[in-house]
UniProtKB/Swiss-Prot annotation:
It holds the Pfam family Ribosomal_S5. PROSITE patterns: RIBOSOMAL_S5, S5_DSRBD. The keyword Nucleotidyltransferase does not apply. InterPro entries: Ribosomal_Su5_D2-typ_SF, Ribosomal_uS5, Ribosomal_uS5_bac-type, Ribosomal_uS5_C, Ribosomal_uS5_N, Ribosomal_uS5_N_CS, Ribsml_uS5_D2-typ_fold_subgr. This is Small ribosomal subunit protein uS5. The N-terminal domain interacts with the head of the 30S subunit; the C-terminal domain interacts with the body and contacts protein S4. The interaction surface between S4 and S5 is involved in control of translational fidelity. GO terms for molecular function: rRNA binding; structural constituent of ribosome. The lineage of its organism: Bacteria, Pseudomonadati, Pseudomonadota, Gammaproteobacteria, Pseudomonadales. Residues 12-75 form the S5 DRBM domain.
Amino acid sequence: MANNDQKRDEGYIEKLVQVNRVAKTVKGGRIFTFTALTVVGDGKGRVGFGRGKSREVPAAIQKAMEAARRNMIQVDLKGTTLQYATKAAHGASKVYMQPASEGTGIIAGGAMRAVLEVAGVQNVLAKCYGSTNPVNVVHATFKGLKAMQSPESIAAKRGKTVEEIF
């Protein structure tokens, strides 16, 4: 499992979460292909993930990075942490994320850490339950981040002020 960090011209932070070799058995032997899982973010709340497949590792990574840039979402952050504690699941992977005080850092494992870092979250407590398959953990983390809304956006949808909601 690789964990690469790159900055590009566009201001995006790119992280390689996983490279996996897959073998297809055919009459003449085995055909090896590679799959790559990457996350891309601007460090200010925009984050995306992508998967790419190819016969060569660099091509798979490139395809995954392009897919991640096309699949970006906006996360409503509260400073450098999350708005509130949230849970999400994808397949057998379940994730729990909660805001943390300033100076805590990112307390999260593996694939979850990569997503939170590129999203711009700097203080968070997170835990992964069930399956730790990186693909499912990234999906679950995205579901949790995507479902999170700021009090301002909830107030606007209801046609009320933030004070009326609390």
